[in-house]
């Protein structure tokens, strides 16, 4: 319903865009008369008109002229003139919409116009692609147009240094992947100097394949992590146990929810294997996460589908695009469990240093736009989360592709036999075929079948993605057979007869020419070589059209309709003929997860042979229903991720804003002194409370204060008069005033001391280093504790409480406690850290000086003393300035190596025998003791693992 409501004004928007395109067209004659130099000079003219103080123009005012200039430049440089529908798409992008343009309609060229227009403002434009190859290709290819018009173009690649990134971001237009933009944002907020920053703001972004990045990728947060302690031997031990456990006997699996649940027999089996009495006892509870991960690795993560193993390393495969996600790792120990399952090196677990979801990263931009061939199915989500409207841009030529109905077979074997027969028939008549699969395993199986039938073919999957552009560029040639995993975001059009631009570029590169390194020679050779390639490709394209155009064959329905539509959309581009069909079986994952039993019953009643397919509306409805259910589930997951991350997002904004103030502040003395006052005020409040002066324990207060700074006054000097106690005369305000003056005196003395040791400005440098180190360390600890809070917050629903509300409330309390802890530790470090006048290496973002660590230990010890100052009130109210942590209640577990029978032995550091829960007889059974432990809620904090970057 919401999608329909959102489309009500679409017709008016399309008419508005059509008027813009028509007006741009009326300017073409005047622009065509300009020389190259005059056309290039238009850029400076536009910039002057924007900056005019008396009569400034807006980007909207310049749109028609700027679009006309960019359109003419594209024609002169690329021999490609954007069609009117592309100008309409460009206008939609400038207005901050998602332009839905079918495959082959020229989204890459469309992007040139709004990028040029918005770059005139001088704030930078980010063009976001799905991989490094497309970012580099588009920056070179479309960058030729921008450079012709006098703009600078940069590209962000994974291998670049910070200096190279900074140069790229300072360009007028910057290409890069969503991951690189996001990680650079996180790294900038871990920098210890303004000189280390690379980005310069978030003003305007155009996201290519916007549905893939903003929808599919939204469930996966970007995480920068560092090493953490972990017990890799437990992963190995549970990888040994998992194959010994039987499904539906020891555990159950829910494929729809992608969860596993351990039965009572499974728990007893594990306890017997490990030689422990109670798996759910506090000391053993970390083992539960190892068990769950091992079972998930066994049942829910398949090799050559969800991941591949290359050179002894487990690499994740993107379920939507089929690409390898280099540098990505599953979190919560899942990646280590898979490594143990595959018997490869188990890499250390990691701790989160910085994180953000793509949803919240892209909401940083002042203006956001996107392009894709399939957006209407996700229009409601794009509007709800990103406030983006979706505009369907008409095709330049009518679509004449024939989409055949699905064929459903009883078995996978029968389905693949039919697929190979169909492809062989098409190959024989010279028709190019694109076969879409959902996994690496399936693509390689089909490849073997084609080899047996002696059908030449190319395979494009996660193992061969480096050859992606070459394979796709020739996939439309006569007799071409291409087996590929999911085609989402491939970026290179399948052109009948071959991709002319790609083939021309390939020939020029073979001659040693490069559009960036040798631009003049490249441009000259391009214009001479292009007509030759065009003629060759045109002749072959006619033969392909006579054979029926590109035939797209899907071997399985994806859980997302968009992915199916994107696969189909590879055929029938620009009015070309084409055909598509999906071959399905009851063994397909989607069919098994939803309504598979009903379909199997239908086929059984029809009594059809395995090799005879059916075509029925019931099947089509069942598939659509299944896909809709999955899409709705995924939408709910993404909304839930966003709701919880919104809590962290507000906290992240506060911390990052504070870091930036520290980085930019030339003199942090006032801020440091404010912290000193806040900390001492909190200490005094905790010591005085609401009682009378004679009830105050000033000795405990002084003991606590001495852990922070060298106190120069004594309690006696305030409370004694003529050697007699006069506590009734001392007020809380007098006590606080005296201590604040003393602290300011001590701070001035500390500054003089440092200047004598290290010269002028030493205290200012120490302030910056201390504040940055403390804020980074406390934020890192806070991320860990917030993750831990979120892991168990769902259990609050059992107490009739809203988990999200509880997460918001407790997260706020923890955040405020962290801010108080930052102040307290910063003050202690400023007064106590040792400073020497020797050159020091740059401080790494996650590093912490040894002196700070030593003081942190001392401060922790002093915290216990301070808790007695107010008779334990600090334990009840977290308003005092100290960090609030979530500590494990159980001894640490270590791995002592396997016993003679190969089982793992549990040792407890400093622990003894298992303790029987209170209220349980000594002779109680294992099950009774375990249930008692569960009821008492005795649980320990499980080991934490995060994604690695």
UniProtKB/Swiss-Prot annotation:
Function: Part of the Sec protein translocase complex. Interacts with the SecYEG preprotein conducting channel. Has a central role in coupling the hydrolysis of ATP to the transfer of proteins into and across the cell membrane, serving as an ATP-driven molecular motor driving the stepwise translocation of polypeptide chains across the membrane.
Protein name per its UniProtKB record: Protein translocase subunit SecA 1
Subcellular locations according to the entry: Cell membrane; Cytoplasm
Biased composition, class Basic and acidic residues, residue ranges: 925-934
Top-level taxon in the UniProt lineage: Bacteria
GO cellular component entries: cell envelope Sec protein transport complex; cytosol; extracellular region; peptidoglycan-based cell wall; plasma membrane
PROSITE patterns linked to this entry: SECA, SECA_MOTOR_DEAD
């Amino acid at each position: 319903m919401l999608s329909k409501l959102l489309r009500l004004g679409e017709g008016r928007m399309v008419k508005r865009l059509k008027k813009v395109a028509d007006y741009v067209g009326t300017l073409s004659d005047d622009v065509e008369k300009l020389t190259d130099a005059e056309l290039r000079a238009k850029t400076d003219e536009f910039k002057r008109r924007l900056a005019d103080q008396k009569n400034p123009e807006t980007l909207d005012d310049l749109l028609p002229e700027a679009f006309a200039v960019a359109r003419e430049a594209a024609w002169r440089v690329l021999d490609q003139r954007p069609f009117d529908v592309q100008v309409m798409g460009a206008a939609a992008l400038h207005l901050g919409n998602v332009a839905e343009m079918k495959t082959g309609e020229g989204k890459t060229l469309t992007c040139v116009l709004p990028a040029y227009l918005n770059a005139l403002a001088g704030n930078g434009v980010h063009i976001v692609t799905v991989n490094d190859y497309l970012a580099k290709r588009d920056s070179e290819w479309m960058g030729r147009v921008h450079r012709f018009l006098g703009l600078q173009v940069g590209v962000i690649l994974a291998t670049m240094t910070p200096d190279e990134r900074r140069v790229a971001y300072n360009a007028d237009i910057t290409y890069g992947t969503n991951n690189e933009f996001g990680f650079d944002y996180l790294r900038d907020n871990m920098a210890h100097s303004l000189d280390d920053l690379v980005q310069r703001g978030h003003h305007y972004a155009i996201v290519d394949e916007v549905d893939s990045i903003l929808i599919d990728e939204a469930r996966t947060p970007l995480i920068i992590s560092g090493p953490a302690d972990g017990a890799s031997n437990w992963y190995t031990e549970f990888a040994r146990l998992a194959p010994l456990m039987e499904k539906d006997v020891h555990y159950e699996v829910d494929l729809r929810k992608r969860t596993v649940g351990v039965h009572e027999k499974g728990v007893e089996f594990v306890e017997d294997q490990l030689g422990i009495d109670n798996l759910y006892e506090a000391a053993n509870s970390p083992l539960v996460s190892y068990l769950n991960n091992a079972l998930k690795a066994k049942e829910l993560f398949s090799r050559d589908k969800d991941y591949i193993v290359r050179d002894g390393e487990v690499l994740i495969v993107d379920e939507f695009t089929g690409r390898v996600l280099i540098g990505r790792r599953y979190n919560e120990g899942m990646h280590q469990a898979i490594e143990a399952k595959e018997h490869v090196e188990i890499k250390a677990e990691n701790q989160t240093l910085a994180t953000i979801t793509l949803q919240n990263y892209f909401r940083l931009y002042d203006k956001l736009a996107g392009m894709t061939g399939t957006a209407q199915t996700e229009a409601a989500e794009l509007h709800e989360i990103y406030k983006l409207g979706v505009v369907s841009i008409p095709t330049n030529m009518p679509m004449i592709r024939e989409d055949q109905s699905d064929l459903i077979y009883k078995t996978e074997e029968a389905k693949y036999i039919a697929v190979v027969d169909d492809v062989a028939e098409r190959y024989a008549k010279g028709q190019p075929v694109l076969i879409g699969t959902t996994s690496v395993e399936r693509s390689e199986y089909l490849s073997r079948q084609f080899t047996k039938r002696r059908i030449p073919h190319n395979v494009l999957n996660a193992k061969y993605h480096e050859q992606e552009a070459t394979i796709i560029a020739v996939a439309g040639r006569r007799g071409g057979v291409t087996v590929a995993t999911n085609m989402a975001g491939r970026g290179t059009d399948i052109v009948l007869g071959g991709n002319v631009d790609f083939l021309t570029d390939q020939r020029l590169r073979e001659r040693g020419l490069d559009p960036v390194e040798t631009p003049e020679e490249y441009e000259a050779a391009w214009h001479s070589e292009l007509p030759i390639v065009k003629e060759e490709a045109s002749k072959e394209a006619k033969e392909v059209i006579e054979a029926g155009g590109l035939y797209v064959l899907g071997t399985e329905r994806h859980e997302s309709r968009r992915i199916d539509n994107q696969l189909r959309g590879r055929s029938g581009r620009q009015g070309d003929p084409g055909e598509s069909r999906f071959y399905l079986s009851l063994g397909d994952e989607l069919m098994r997860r939803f309504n598979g039993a009903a379909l199997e019953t239908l086929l059984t009643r029809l009594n059809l042979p395995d090799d005879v397919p059916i075509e029925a509306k019931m099947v089509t409805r069942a598939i659509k229903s299944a896909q809709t259910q999955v899409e709705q589930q995924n939408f709910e997951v993404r909304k839930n991720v966003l709701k919880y991350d919104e809590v962290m997002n507000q906290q992240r904004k506060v911390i990052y804003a504070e870091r930036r103030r520290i980085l930019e502040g030339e003199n942090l003395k006032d801020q440091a002194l404010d912290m000193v006052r806040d900390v001492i005020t909190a200490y005094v409040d905790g010591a005085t409370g609401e009682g009378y002066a004679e009830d105050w324990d000033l000795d405990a207060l002084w003991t606590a204060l001495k852990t922070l700074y060298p106190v120069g006054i004594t309690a006696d000097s305030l409370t004694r008069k003529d050697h007699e106690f006069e506590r009734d005369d001392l007020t809380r305000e007098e006590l606080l005033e005296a201590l604040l003056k003393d602290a300011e005196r001590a701070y001035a003395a500390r500054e003089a001391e440092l200047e004598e040791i290290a010269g002028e400005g030493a205290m200012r440098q120490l302030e910056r280093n201390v504040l940055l180190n403390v804020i980074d360390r406390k934020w890192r600890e806070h991320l860990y504790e917030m993750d831990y809070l979120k892991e168990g917050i769902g259990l609050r629903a059992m107490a009739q409480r809203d988990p999200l509300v509880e997460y918001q409330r407790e997260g706020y309390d923890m955040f405020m406690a962290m801010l108080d802890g930052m102040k307290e530790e910063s003050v202690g470090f400023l007064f106590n850290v040792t400073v020497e006048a020797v050159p020091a290496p740059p401080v790494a973002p996650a590093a912490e000086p040894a002196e700070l660590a030593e003081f942190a230990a001392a401060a922790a010890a002093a915290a216990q003393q301070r808790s007695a100052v107010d008779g334990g009130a600090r334990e009840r109210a977290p308003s005092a300035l100290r960090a609030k942590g979530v500590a494990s209640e159980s001894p640490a577990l270590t791995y002592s190596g396997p016993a003679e029978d190969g089982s793992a032995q549990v040792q407890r550091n400093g622990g003894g025998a298992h303790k029987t829960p209170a209220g349980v007889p000594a002779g109680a059974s294992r099950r009774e003791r375990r249930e008692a432990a569960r009821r008492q809620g005795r649980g320990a904090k499980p080991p934490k693992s995060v994604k690695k970057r």
